[in-house]
């Protein structure tokens, strides 16, 4: 992956990247959300670990970490964001190799939404 502070800077500020678009973990909507940042993601923040069969750290717990100014929150979200961009770059390389851009847009709905001159909110 290229050298960029985007994943960690956003992670430190409670912004997580997902295939469907950005997720702001400080928002009140995450207060009671028991889902992980991105279901199916295999990063350390999202994947099931020993004792947590249903998944990794919930959005509500991550929000709590940020609100309490605990360092674990920024660390976990930064690791998730780095994993997110590594997965994106891997899929882009595969799409180039296989000339299958439509498959890339299926896997990454956020890219489809941004394509063209659409007047949709980001």
Regions inferred by a protein language model and the residue ranges of each:
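Alpha/beta catalytic cores of nucleotide-metabolism and tRNA/nucleoside-modifying enzymes
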Residues: 1-122
């Amino acid at each position: 992956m290229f050298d960029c502070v985007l994943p960690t800077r956003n992670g430190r500020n409670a912004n997580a990247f997902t295939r469907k678009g950005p997720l702001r973990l400080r928002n009140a909507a995450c207060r009671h959300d028991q889902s992980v940042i991105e279901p199916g993601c295999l990063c350390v923040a999202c994947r099931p670990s020993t004792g947590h069969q249903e998944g990794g750290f919930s959005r509500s717990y991550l929000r709590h970490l940020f609100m309490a100014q605990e360092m674990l929150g920024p660390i976990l979200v930064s690791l998730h964001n780095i994993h997110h961009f590594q997965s994106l770059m891997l899929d882009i390389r595969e799409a180039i190799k296989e000339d299958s851009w439509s498959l890339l847009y299926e896997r990454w709905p956020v890219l489809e939404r941004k394509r063209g001159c659409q007047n949709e909110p980001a």
